[in-house]
């Protein structure tokens, strides 16, 4: 019985901690959500442009290397 308790106790403690965390968390209000959404969209755009420009620079370099 002691071995079963040793096996189950970490899962039980994790579930208890998870429930406590979810109860303490609150949903963001509309203003906070919009701020987070805009920041995420700006980040996606910046990463997209960086990827685009890296690809744009590497295409001619690749053609020079392969074309030789």
From Swiss-Prot:
Signal peptide positions (record): none
Gene Ontology CC annotation, any one: endoplasmic reticulum membrane
Membrane topology: Single-pass membrane protein
Presence of keyword Transcription regulation: no
One Pfam family in the UniProt entry: SecE
An example molecular function term from Gene Ontology annotations: protein transmembrane transporter activity
Keyword Ribonucleoprotein annotated: no
GO biological process, one term: protein targeting to ER
Keywords, alphabetical: Endoplasmic reticulum, Membrane, Protein transport, Translocation, Transmembrane, Transmembrane helix, Transport
Topology feature Extracellular, residues: 62-68
Compartments where found: Endoplasmic reticulum membrane
UniProt topological domain (Cytoplasmic) ranges: 1-32
Ranges that cross the membrane: 33-61
SUPFAM superfamilies: Preprotein translocase SecE subunit
Similarity comment: family membership: Belongs to the SecE/SEC61-gamma family.
Physiological role: Necessary for protein translocation in the endoplasmic reticulum.
HAMAP family assigned: SecE (MF_00422)
NCBIfam families found in the cross-reference section: secE_euk_arch
Assembly and binders: Heterotrimeric complex composed of SEC61-alpha, SEC61-beta and SEC61-gamma.
Protein name: Protein transport protein Sec61 subunit gamma
Annotated organism of origin: Gryllotalpa orientalis (Oriental mole cricket)
């Amino acid at each position: 019985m002691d071995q079963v308790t040793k096996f189950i106790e970490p899962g039980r403690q994790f579930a208890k901690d998870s429930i406590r965390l979810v109860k303490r968390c609150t949903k963001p209000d509309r203003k906070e959500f919009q701020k987070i959404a805009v920041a995420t969209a700006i980040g996606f755009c910046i990463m997209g442009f960086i990827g685009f420009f890296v690809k744009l620079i590497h295409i001619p370099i690749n053609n020079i290397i392969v074309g030789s």
